[in-house]
Swiss-Prot record:
It is found in: Cytoplasm. Pfam families: SepF. The keyword Cell cycle applies. This is Cell division protein SepF. It comes from Gloeothece citriformis (strain PCC 7424) (Cyanothece sp. (strain PCC 7424)). Gene3D superfamilies: SepF-like protein (3.30.110.150). It comes from the Bacteria. Belongs to the SepF family. GO terms for cellular component: cytoplasm. The lineage of its organism: Bacteria, Bacillati, Cyanobacteriota, Cyanophyceae, Oscillatoriophycideae. The keyword Cell cycle applies. Residues 32-54 are annotated as: Disordered. Disulfide bonds: none annotated. Cell division protein that is part of the divisome complex and is recruited early to the Z-ring. Probably stimulates Z-ring formation, perhaps through the cross-linking of FtsZ protofilaments. Its function overlaps with FtsA. HAMAP family: SepF.
């Protein structure tokens, strides 16, 4: 049981032995400490909390990186949102084995026009059911465009026609406040039961 938790922590990146950078920092701190102790004692105005000093030094260390080199960055972008340009992918599969590629395209927040005219009707029905399930799982939308042609969109796409909106992008729900009651509804009944 302990090994499962350890593996999970390693996978997520919160393991306890993830301090390779910490040892380097401690060595730098030790070297600087030995240099400052060998010189004369610091004046009271030069003393500052260690936390502020470490913050300032870490900022200085990152600013010393030469241009053209990349630093390690923990920010991961949303797939498919590189330029802010929406993309529609037209896929004309020949077999059901190509359907996971359609789901992956939807997960990358790209709309898919699926033309199933080439496929066998039974296999095409199976493919539509599969992609519709994947679309539902990512809160997307599906629309039949024509005979054996379907549009699948992720949740961030608004689908509309000349006559009106077919599917609108859901807005984030606002917190609703409930009116508070001064006396509980069950108060009278509870007192009757208690007697």
């Amino acid at each position: 049981m302990n090994t499962i938790l350890t593996k999970l922590k390693d996978f997520v990146g919160i393991s306890e032995h993830d301090d390779e950078y910490e040892t380097d920092y401690e060595e730098m701190e030790y070297d600087r400490y030995s240099k400052t102790n060998s010189s004369e004692t610091l004046a009271p105005e030069e003393e500052e909390p260690i936390r502020n000093r470490r913050t300032r030094e870490s900022l200085n260390l990152t600013s010393d990186v030469p241009m053209g080199t990349t630093t390690r960055n923990n920010v991961i972008g949303m797939p498919g949102i590189t330029n802010g340009i929406a993309e529609v992918v037209v896929i004309e599969p020949h077999s059901f084995e190509e359907m996971p590629q359609v789901i992956q395209t939807l997960r990358e927040r790209k709309s898919v026009v699926l033309n199933l005219n080439v496929m066998d009707p039974e296999e095409a029905q199976r493919a539509v059911d599969f992609v519709a399930g994947g679309t539902y799982a990512i809160d997307g939308h599906q629309e039949r465009i024509g005979e054996s042609i379907f549009l699948f969109t992720p949740s961030c796409v608004k689908v509309s026609t000349l006559t009106g909106t077919v599917h609108d992008v859901p807005e984030t729900p606002k917190a609703t406040t409930r009116p508070t009651m001064s006396t509980p509804v069950w108060g009278a009944e509870a007192s009757r039961i208690a007697q």
